[in-house]
């Protein structure tokens, strides 16, 4: 009888360990292949080591001083100017 209970507990614990291991491995691969590219998610997790998807300069003050350094930066909705209508 105790043999059956022990075997049942062993199978239960082994199943939990395998499921947890698969979840951790899945999260690791998804993080490194996709999620680490988003600066917002890196800030939430506190990961400063992986800078793969970050194309910004290390210090924000340098980027603010030279606006011509990033010509591809989109303006926010507040900064956009409506198109000029010439009346044609």
UniProtKB/Swiss-Prot annotation:
Residues 72-81 have a biased composition (Basic residues). Residues 48-60 have a biased composition (Polar residues). Its main location: membrane. Pfam families: DUF4750 (PF15938). Residues 48-88 are annotated as: Disordered. It is a single-pass membrane protein. The modification Phosphoserine is found at residues 59, 61, 70. One of its GO terms (cellular component) is membrane. It comes from the Eukaryota. The keyword Transmembrane applies. The chain crosses the membrane at residues 10-30. The keyword Transmembrane applies. Keywords: Membrane, Phosphoprotein, Transmembrane, Transmembrane helix. It is found in: Membrane. Belongs to the SMIM13 family. This is Small integral membrane protein 13. It comes from Rattus norvegicus (Rat).
């Amino acid at each position: 009888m105790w043999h059956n209970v022990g075997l049942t507990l062993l199978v239960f614990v082994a199943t939990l360990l395998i499921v947890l291991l698969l979840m951790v491995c899945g999260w690791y691969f998804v993080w490194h292949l996709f999620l680490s590219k988003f600066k917002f998610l890196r800030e939430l997790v506190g990961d400063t080591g992986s800078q793969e998807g970050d194309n910004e300069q290390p210090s924000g003050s340098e980027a603010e001083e030279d606006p011509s350094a990033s010509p591809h930066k989109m303006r926010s909705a507040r900064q956009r100017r409506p198109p000029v209508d010439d009346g044609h």
